A protein has these predicted regions:
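P-loop NTP-binding core
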Residues: 1-275
Length: 275
């Protein structure tokens, strides 16, 4: 209800980026699960797959019927209009599918100013925002024109990371990258927080790293209390689509639900601080 009030007062979508500069942190799966849950909870959402590999699109296609858009994502960016690049998955859920043609984007924007290049997606999303409650962007795990575009177009960034040494050290670099773009082009950008992704739940090293992560961010409370643990169920869903009636379905789904609701709670808190 509180979220509904905030969305009504904004009259336009809240844009969330799900991103980190490292693959294998469960990023696209998190986006897929959020798409599934937003649909389930009657939020009107546009998912944007700004990834050449189109991982999110392929994953969503296992659960929803995904058709090809009239105009692919790259052509939409090139033409300056994304309306024809949107496909409808359900009454609530829309998608701009990823396409390998996105690899042509750096060539298209090569002669542009850095500002115009970085603002491209933000500019083209502006007229679509009033149609949705949330817009969730999934993009490549590397510094690139794709990521810059996504960061500049977003209100919030959510950072999935593996609870292991290496990831925690890279956090600072990633945050500096965000701050750099925020200061130049997107002063309203905020971090929702880090979602820990555990590959091996029994490893003592990972447990101590996770504790360390919570300790480091005790003051700013940036680490989600709810975490994602790797599960075979998710691999099954990636093959056959998301189900809710088979063994362990509910348990794994509720793990994602908890993260989803914590994300919404954090957004509500941040939005209220702005008012």
């Amino acid at each position: 209800e509180e979220l509904r009030r905030i969305l009504n007062s904004k009259n336009e979508a809240i844009v969330i980026l799900n991103n980190y500069f490292k693959g294998g942190v469960g990023k696209s799966k998190l986006s897929t699960m959020f798409a599934y849950l937003t649909d389930k909870f009657n939020l009107k959402v546009l998912m944007i797959d700004k990834d050449l590999q189109a991982t999110l699109t392929k994953d969503l296609a296992k659960t929803f019927k995904v058709e090809l858009p009239r105009v692919n994502f790259y052509e939409g960016l090139k033409n300056g209009n994304l309306a024809s690049s949107i496909v409808h998955l359900t009454d609530n859920l829309d998608l701009i599918p990823g396409t390998f043609d996105l690899m042509l984007l750096p060539k298209l924007t090569r002669s542009w100013t850095f500002e115009n290049e970085s603002r491209l997606l933000a500019t083209l999303l502006a007229p679509l925002k009033s149609d949705y409650d949330l817009i969730i962007i999934d993009t490549v795990p590397t510094p690139s024109v794709y990521t810059n575009n996504a960061i500049v177009a977003s209100d919030y960034v959510m950072i999935p990371l593996q609870a292991e040494e290496e990831s925690t050290n890279n956090i600072q670099n990633y945050i500096s990258y965000l701050i750099d773009l925020q200061e130049q082009f997107n002063p309203g950008l905020d971090m929702i927080g880090f979602v820990p992704y555990l590959v091996d739940t029994d490893s003592a090293t990972i447990k101590s790293n996770l504790e360390e992560l919570y300790k480091q961010h005790k003051e700013d409370n940036l680490v989600f209390q709810n975490i994602i643990k790797r599960s075979n169920k998710v691999s099954t869903w990636s093959k056959n689509g998301i189900t809710e009636h088979k063994g362990y379905d509910k348990k794994v789904l509720s793990m994602y639900e908890n993260v989803f609701f914590e994300m919404l709670e954090r957004i509500i808190q941040l939005e209220n601080e702005k008012e």
